Amino acid sequence: TKSRYRNRRSRPRRRYGRRMRKTRCRRKGRRISRRPRHTTYRRRVRKIVHLKRRSRPRDEIDNLKVKNNRRLNESLKQHRLPMRVPV
């Protein structure tokens, strides 16, 4: 069993309020949906955690990359100067 009195050397990290509790162990690449829950359901309903992109199947990731690249190219085309200036 755990000792009843915590080790004095390790100071407990102070967190204030619900917001700090909510974001305590949110890891990188993992988003928690901001759907508000009624307080009575809070203990029963787990937070909806969106999957990391890395855990998706490979082809889906490739599709995402293609989509993002296309979008980026389109936005770059708008800002690109014309190559040949008409004389």
UniProtKB/Swiss-Prot annotation:
| Coiled-coil portions | none
Instruction: Report residue spans for region: Disordered.
Output: 1-36
Where does this one sit in the cell?
Answer: Nucleus; Chromosome
| Record bears the keyword DNA-binding | yes
Q: Main location per UniProt?
A: nucleus
Q: Which GO terms describe its biological process?
A: cell differentiation; spermatogenesis
An example of a Gene Ontology cellular component annotation for this protein is: nucleosome
- Superkingdom of the source species: Eukaryota
Which keywords belong to this entry? Chromosome, Developmental protein, Differentiation, DNA-binding, Nucleosome core, Nucleus, Spermatogenesis
GO MF annotation list: DNA binding
What is the role of this chain? Involved in nuclear basic protein transition: histones are replaced by spermatid specific proteins which are themselves replaced by protamines in late spermatids.
What is this protein's record name?
Spermatid-specific protein S1
Organism of this sequence:
Scyliorhinus canicula (Small-spotted catshark)
Q: What is the lineage of its organism?
A: Eukaryota, Metazoa, Chordata, Craniata, Vertebrata
